[in-house]
């Protein structure tokens, strides 16, 4: 298991594992020690340096992205060929970084379009080489957990809530959730999560239970009608928590989730901004309707696919018994 985001600390019950995004470093993120030593010997990086993408000149960022990708491929190739494994799960995360800082260059024929395309040619070549080196009885799957689109505006939703009278603070020096006032009626967390400041649930709750439905409906309507400076609706849709969340911890689910239209990146933060709509260093953002999936199996049916379908598909391909009722998804094979 190599470089899966948010998997630190590495599990000790798998053959090899290096955790990915949000890990403190290879020294602590890799198990066993032999894996750590090998990764360090090839200058393996857990992630490209996104701060380099903030510069107007993207040359250093692009060079760092290639170095990260090259070492990732070398490590994948090494262990795919060396080890006897049942499941090899690896993540090329550098595509996400490149998309965040170069995607608009690609879509709108800007300065770094050629560098963007050349990076993806290399990704494609590496995937092809991995596929060619796999034994005949191994099925290769390539999946992304989201798509990408050009970014036009960052939307600072807590500033919008403050401007519209939903959110207020104890004083002018505010920077986190603890600083909201007892009069606040709603607040937002990334990405696009909205919470009614409900009495009995929130530490400084102000909205009585009897007013919850009406307040939520009012906020939902306001979000659905919100337009950006370009006249386009910010939200593709706004989903109530009963529709989106189920399980043992649904009590902590947001009351509303805003799904953005392409071009709007939904932000939160409690420090305040001069304007609701702004621009940051990124020009590409996640999208939710154009993720990709490739299954190298003639029996695979890829229609109406959900991210949840990947786990039962892998179990089927590995001929593992499982209770289909325990999974939200369904096997594609």
Question: Regions from the language model: what does each represent?
Answer:
Residues 1-108, 185-186, 190-205, 211, ...:
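His/Asp/Glu-rich, glycine-adjacent segments
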Residues 1-5, 170, 175-301, 307-313, ...:
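Active-site neighborhoods of enzymes that stabilize oxyanions during catalysis
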Residues 16-38, 108-117, 158-177:
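Acidic, His- and aromatic-enriched active-site or binding-groove loops in soluble protein domains
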Residues 87-91, 141, 294:
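Structural motif
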Residues 101-129, 133, 276, 293:
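Extended hydrophobic/aromatic segments used for targeting, binding, or gating
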Residues 104-108, 154-163, 254, 272-275:
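Short secondary-structure boundary/capping segments
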Residues 120-161, 236-241, 249-250, 256-259, ...:
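Metal-dependent active-site segment of extracytoplasmic phospho-/sulfohydrolases and closely related
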Residues 326-333:
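Cytosolic regulatory/linker segments at or just downstream of nucleotide-handling modules
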């Amino acid at each position: 298991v190599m470089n899966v985001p948010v998997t630190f600390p590495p599990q000790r019950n798998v053959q090899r594992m290096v955790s990915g995004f949000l890990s403190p470093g290879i020294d602590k993120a890799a198990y066993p020690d032999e894996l750590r030593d090998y990764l360090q010997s090839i200058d393996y990086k857990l992630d490209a340096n996104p701060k380099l993408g903030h510069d107007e000149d993207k040359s250093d960022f692009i060079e760092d992205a290639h170095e990260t990708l090259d070492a990732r491929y070398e490590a994948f190739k090494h262990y795919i060929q060396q080890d006897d494994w049942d499941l090899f799960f690896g993540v090329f995360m550098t595509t996400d970084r490149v998309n965040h800082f170069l995607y608009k260059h690609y879509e709108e024929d800007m300065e770094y379009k050629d560098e963007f395309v050349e990076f993806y040619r290399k990704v494609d070549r590496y995937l092809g080489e991995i596929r060619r080196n796999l034994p005949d009885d191994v099925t290769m799957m390539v999946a992304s957990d989201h798509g990408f689109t050009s970014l036009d505006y960052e939307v600072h939703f807590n500033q919008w809530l403050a401007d519209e009278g939903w959110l207020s603070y104890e004083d002018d020096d505010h920077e986190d959730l603890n600083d909201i006032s007892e009069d606040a009626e709603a607040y937002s967390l990334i990405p696009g999560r909205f919470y009614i400041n409900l009495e009995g649930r929130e530490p400084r709750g102000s909205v009585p239970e009897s007013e919850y439905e009406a307040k939520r409906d009012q906020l939902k309507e306001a979000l659905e009608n919100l337009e950006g400076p370009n006249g386009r609706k910010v939200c593709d849709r706004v989903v109530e928590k009963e529709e989106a969340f189920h399980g043992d911890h649904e009590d902590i689910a947001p009351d509303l989730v805003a799904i953005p239209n392409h071009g709007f990146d939904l932000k939160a933060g409690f420090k305040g901004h001069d304007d609701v709509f702004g621009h940051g260093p990124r020009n590409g953002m996640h999208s939710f309707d154009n993720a990709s999936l490739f299954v190298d199996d003639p029996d695979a049916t890829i229609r109406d696919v959900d991210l949840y379908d990947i786990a039962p598909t892998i179990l089927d391909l590995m001929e593992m018994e499982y209770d289909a009722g325990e999974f939200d998804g369904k096997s594609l094979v």
